[in-house]
Structures are given as C-alpha cells and as structure tokens.
C-alpha cells in the first residue's frame, strides 16, 4: 500500500489536472458556440452561390467548363483537414485512418495521388509514415476567416485546373452534434451535376454578359473555394465539440480518481491510527 504522503501527492496533482481539464472544457464549449454561429452565418452565402451556379450552369446544357467536365482519372488529389492541437480524442486519427484506408485501396504508389494537408496533426502523422505532402498549412485560427485558408484552397484548385490531378476529394470530420461527429469524404472537383443544380435558380431568366462561359470561369473557382471554406468551418465545429467532450470525460475521470484516492487515503490513515493505538496499548500493557 502506498504511503499517506504518496497518496496525498497524487490527490493534489489530480485536483490540479482537474482544474485544467475543466477550464479547457469551458473554453472549448465557448469556441463551439462561435463555430456553430460561423457555420450558420455562412450558409446563406452558399445558398446564393448555388443559386448563381444553377442559373448559369444549369440553364446551359452545353457548358464545357473544366470544373464541370469529368475526365479520365490518372491522378487523384486529397485535401485532408485535421487539427493543429491534441487533446481532442480521436478527431484527427479517425479522419486520417479513413484517408489512408482509401489511398491503400485505390492506389498502387504515390505517383497516383497528391495530398494537401490542413493541420499539424495531419502533417506529423503522414510524414512519420512516409507519405509525400504536396502542400500544407498549420496554425489555423480556431475561428478561421476565409482569408486565413484561401491560399490552401487556391493551391488545391490550381492542382486541378493545371491538370496535375483529375479529381479533388476532401476528407474531414463532419459535425453532426455535440456528441457525434463523422469522418467524411466528398468529391469537390469536378463539380457534380447535383452541385451545379442545388440552388433554386431564381436568376435563370436573366441575360448574362458577356456570356455564360466567361461568368462561369469567375464564379466556379469562387464556388469551390466556398465549398472548401464551408467544410473547414464544419470541421472546426467538430474539433471543438470533440475536445469539449474529451475534456469533460477527463474531468469526470479525475473526479472519480480523486474519490478513490480519498477513500484509499482515509483507509490508510485509519490503519495507521489503529496501529498507533495498538502500539500504545501494547506498550502500556508491557509496563504493567
């Protein structure tokens, strides 16, 4: 059995850790509320962008824009969104596991794909396993602005536009609820027919100048940038929710450990007192 001093030291250190995890839980909860608000505020913009895409691309059956035209896939592109920090449970690990599983199932060697990474966790994981990273960005704000991730989005889009890849897939953790997030993948390039016809098409009766192809060349890259940014906002909400849950579980576990250690301390203290009383009684009896 551990000594009273050792048990007391463990109780004190666990209490300090509990204070830290409780504070981190509260911080993550606050960040989650802001992330949910950011995602909600971004939705109307995406709806309007989809309306514009529907009006321009959906109204024209013979559009030939590269972002709307599937081509033979010889090289795939993967944009994976992970966190910069730890203490978020299996948030990054689940996304990376899904990515690696799909890459190993689809490709024979690294010449068949390119990887773009957001987040230090993803960079470290892939480098340690020998994967080549085409482009990476770390130290992304907890509440990212569009400007803060625009370079990443542009690089991924340029890979497709310059035909270095023939498709772009994004891997991330989709925020379902505070208690649930789902490792998800989706193809963002080429844009599917569904993507170009999701809007309500309120602009379809307009005449476009100079022509629809010229307009598509401007708004389609902006639309894909928006898809990527919206996905990053979704992933950030998932990250904050996962970290909040992880810190709550850590706090609960610390509370349980403190209770167990306190019980062990009291038992050890009682045993020590009992032994001291026994020794005193035994000494008194010997003197008689």
UniProtKB/Swiss-Prot annotation:
Location (main, coarse): membrane
Subcellular location: Cell membrane
Keywords: ATP synthesis, Cell membrane, CF(1), Hydrogen ion transport, Ion transport, Membrane, Transport
GO biological process: proton motive force-driven plasma membrane ATP synthesis
Family matches, as SUPFAM superfamilies: ATP synthase (F1-ATPase), gamma subunit
InterPro entries linked: ATP_synth_F1_ATPase_gsu (IPR035968), ATP_synth_F1_gsu (IPR000131)
Gene Ontology CC entries for this record: plasma membrane; proton-transporting ATP synthase complex
Gene Ontology molecular function: any one: ATP binding
Family: Belongs to the ATPase gamma chain family.
PANTHER family, alphabetized: ATP SYNTHASE GAMMA CHAIN (PTHR11693), ATP SYNTHASE SUBUNIT GAMMA, MITOCHONDRIAL (PTHR11693:SF22)
Complex and partners: F-type ATPases have 2 components, CF(1) - the catalytic core - and CF(0) - the membrane proton channel. CF(1) has five subunits: alpha(3), beta(3), gamma(1), delta(1), epsilon(1). CF(0) has three main subunits: a, b and c.
Protein name (Swiss-Prot/TrEMBL): ATP synthase gamma chain
